[in-house]
Amino acid sequence: SSAASDVYKRQANIDDADMKEACDLIRAGELVAFPTETVYGLGADALHPEASKKIYAAKGRPSDNPLIVHISKFEDLVSIAREVPPQAKKLADAFWPGPLTMIVWKNDRVPYETTGGMDTVAIRMPKHPVALRLIEGSGCLIAAPSANTSGKPSPTEASHVALDMDGRIPMILDGGPVGIGIESTIVDLSEETPMILRPGYITQEMLQEVLGEEVRMDPGIIASDSTRKPKAPGMKYKHYAPKADLVLVEGETDKVVARINELVREKQQLGQKVGVIATDETFLRYEADHVVSIGAREDEDAIARHLYKILREFDDWNVDAIYSESFATPRIGQAIMNRLLKAAGHQVIPV
């Protein structure tokens, strides 16, 4: 593997030569990590079966987990879909480029290696200049999951990628910290009624408003049933998990604080190091080894951005247990809670 400095290409100076090198690597069937507006992606030529296999190998991820295909224009979707659902154009006009992934029936151009063996394909147009330059410059559609090893929190800055992918990939395009920090909303358009398979920044209400029809929410988002074959990435395995055991405590604020402090004391008496995920409002009320505020409770965008970074920080501090407040906020709260519930393996204590 080359020195880290060769791999790193900072946004400020991702010059044409760097971009050309990245595009050449993609065309040659190699892997390049790149920023999107949601998280860093681990990209390869989506229509090249061997390239997609390299992604699974680098991530250590099971290959029945579909990859999202990143495109730069609506015609790219048309070129790989068996049929274009009527909703696709409406949603693309409203939300692309942006954090929305659509699932449609694939045609024969898309190898099963990219779709995790499914007859459907997940497609998104990212809203990030580096991502779009890479797609356009390589002339390839780029399959990319998040650029972390499987089960680790998703990377929101290039240093996270370097840490996880050390020596496994030839290039990281460093675009600085990313904006949203929570993955795209995934909507399945392959059936009669559109269905959200993964909540995200674009909400159910927003989709319904644009489509003027009902959009359902996959019951699996709330339940933890992992027996069905996953149609969307990350639906099957314990995901975004920190190394420590994470438990959510849910209820009225004063009761939550009291209960978490009680749990922290119990763990500390056993000689364990404990972390707490708090908000700006409650931060000073906890007595744990490491208390981190995820932001102001009203500021959903900050909570979303900080979530994965904070889960990684607890890994760095080697805490044994983490307790978190619950963030069932109105707008993207559903998406945030979905991530936290998965990270916690659905361990919730109501108070």
Predicted features by range, described:
Residues 1-2:
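Blade-terminus and WD-like Trp-Asp/Gly-His loop motifs, strongest in beta-propeller folds
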Residues 5-351:
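Active-site-adjacent structural elements in enzyme catalytic cores
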